UniProtKB/Swiss-Prot annotation:
Family as reported in the entry's similarity comment: Belongs to the NusB family.
Keywords associated with the record: RNA-binding, Transcription, Transcription antitermination, Transcription regulation
Lineage: Bacteria, Pseudomonadati, Pseudomonadota, Alphaproteobacteria, Hyphomicrobiales
InterPro entries per the UniProt record, alphabetical: NusB-like_sf, NusB_fam, NusB_RsmB_TIM44
Pfam families noted in UniProt: NusB
Highest taxon, organism lineage: Bacteria
Disulphide connectivity of cysteines: none
Protein name: Transcription antitermination protein NusB
One Gene Ontology MF term: RNA binding
Entry coiled-coil feature ranges: none
Biological processes annotated in GO: DNA-templated transcription termination; transcription antitermination
Function comment: Involved in transcription antitermination. Required for transcription of ribosomal RNA (rRNA) genes. Binds specifically to the boxA antiterminator sequence of the ribosomal RNA (rrn) operons.
Organism: Allorhizobium ampelinum (strain ATCC BAA-846 / DSM 112012 / S4)
SUPFAM superfamilies the record matches: NusB-like
Amino acid sequence: MTTENNKPPVKTANQRGAARLAAVQALYQMDIGGTGVLEVVAEYETHRLGQEIDGETYLKADASWFRSIVAGVVRDQTKIDPLIRQALQDDWSLARVDSTVRAILRAGTFELLERKDVPIAVIVTEYVEIAHAFFQEDEPKLVNAVLDRIAKQVRVPAVK
């Protein structure tokens, strides 16, 4: 099925997926710009989530999920970053990782640690898809490998 201009219809992302993407963007903004958590959460909730900016409409997102991820990463960063460092290759430091990838890994690690109600596969897949939105090649593979290693360390796999 296509629209009048022969483009496939846009699939709406689920609200949690949109919240994850917004959280990654907010964490990136905080990392690069030094913006505080309260300021960035207020900005996203007021001006971005579900809003139109420069002709682009942001997806409607689960605001409480968004807040939980951003605030949780900030709160637990001293626990999250060492897990990521351990899951990276031996010669890689967290500072060497691209800022966007770092934000993705932090958000994904937070969910693996704190959102036991969400299956590992859902968390890893969602964050790999977010990586694909920003990168073409190696970065999504890195996100997959690192989050998979962390999941094996912090979660008991689901019994099939």
